[in-house]
Design a protein with these regions (language model features):
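Helical element adjacent to the flavin cofactor pocket in flavoenzyme catalytic cores
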Residues: 130-198
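Glycine-rich FAD pyrophosphate-binding loop
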Residues: 7-30
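Central helical "cap/lid" subdomain
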Residues: 185-235
């Protein structure tokens, strides 16, 4: 996204993207594909932690990013489905319903017709366990995308704009001296290869700490499972619960379900891509007991992805030097925020001062 935005602002620039893996391998191709900007309980939690100004600012960036992404790629290319967003309300979240209008008022200038509505009747309609789920909050402004198609469309657009993309190019060091920046890349034959540039953007999100110690972007691993097909799956849409720590959606008639990082914060603060059996088992339990009770299903796939977080949930975009820019920390909202952050990174790179 940053490279595309830079090329749009400065088409005369030669732009190279160095990608560590054969495919983008942190969260880009491993995210759950949610085109969302914040559930009710997540917004209320952010209001308490960071206040209305910061909460509103990041929601606006998420919405702006989703709008720009859809304009840039088109809904068909990334299989965007405007199916709406839903939040499951359990006993402990019932007090949040009393603050629903508070959240709507905060977002009123973004959605004058309203953002969140309490729909308790959906618990039965959508087949959730009524002993566990007490209500459902509906948000008509969200949806989901096909992550693989989205990344293919971004890569195709980048190549059409003349951007060179090198995969399997793991950056091991960045030397900012002698009037230019040298980026060292691991190479299996020669050991390392150096690329020289006038300016460099570090957009490695959760992996930024490796190249830039002290950058204040903390990794957070997300666990995901995908079920076998479920005949007659009674719902479609993008669903969340527990302040956004759990999320699920339909993929056709399968259920993609992820989250649970809050069960093991310390263990999941890592860049190691592997399964956490404690969380994977909890995801399966919640599927059986809450989300699709009474349904027979198997687990077809399971994986993890690495996200980047900051203490105040605000993205980081800043100049490190005249020739280096740091961007990202999507805080679990990469689909929504990446385009906006990329635009801000490009503005700093294109700055001739």
């Amino acid at each position: 996204s940053a490279a595309i935005s830079l090329k749009e602002k400065a088409p005369e620039r030669s732009v190279l993207v160095l990608e560590r893996g054969l495919f983008p391998s942190g969260a880009s191709t491993r995210n759950a594909g949610f085109a969302c900007f914040g559930s009710l309980t997540e917004i209320l939690s952010d209001l308490k932690k960071t206040g209305p100004d910061k909460t509103l600012a990041v929601v606006e960036k998420r919405l702006k990013g989703l709008e720009k992404l859809r304009q840039r790629l088109g809904d068909t290319a990334m299989d965007y489905q405007p199916v709406g967003g839903y939040e499951l309300i359990f006993d402990k979240e019932l007090p949040a319903l009393a603050e629903l209008e508070k959240a709507n008022e905060l977002l009123q200038h973004l959605h004058p017709e309203g953002t969140y509505t309490n729909r308790p009747g959906l618990v039965k309609t959508l087949g959730f366990n009524p002993e566990k789920v007490k209500s459902v909050v509906f948000n008509p402004h969200e949806g989901h995308v096909h992550t693989g198609k989205m990344m293919q469309a971004l890569l195709k657009l980048a190549q059409e704009k003349g951007i060179e993309v090198r995969t399997g190019a793991e950056v091991t060091a960045i030397d900012n001296s002698a009037g230019q920046v040298t980026v060292q890349v691991k190479e299996p034959v020669r050991g390392t290869v150096g690329f020289q540039a006038q300016k460099v953007a570090v957009c490695t999100n959760a992996f930024s700490e490796t190249l830039l110690p002290g950058c204040q972007i903390v990794p957070g691993r997300g666990q995901v499972i995908l079920t076998t097909p479920i005949p007659g799956l009674p719902w479609q849409g993008a669903f969340h619960f527990d302040e956004g720590y759990y999320y699920f959606r339909n993929v056709g008639n399968r259920v993609l379900f992820g989250g649970g990082r809050n069960l093991a914060f310390e263990a999941e603060t890592t860049t190691v891509l592997q399964d956490n059996q404690q969380i994977q088992q909890e995801l399966q339990r919640l599927l059986r007991e809450v989300i699709i009770p009474g349904q027979t299903f198997g687990i077809e796939q399971q994986w993890s992805g690495i996200m980047g977080f900051t203490d105040d949930k605000q993205p980081i975009v800043k100049k490190l030097t005249d020739r280096m820019v740091l961007g990202f920390a999507c805080n679990g909202m990469g689909v929504a925020l990446a385009t906006t952050i990329g635009e801000e990174v490009a503005l700093l790179l294109a700055d001739k001062t």
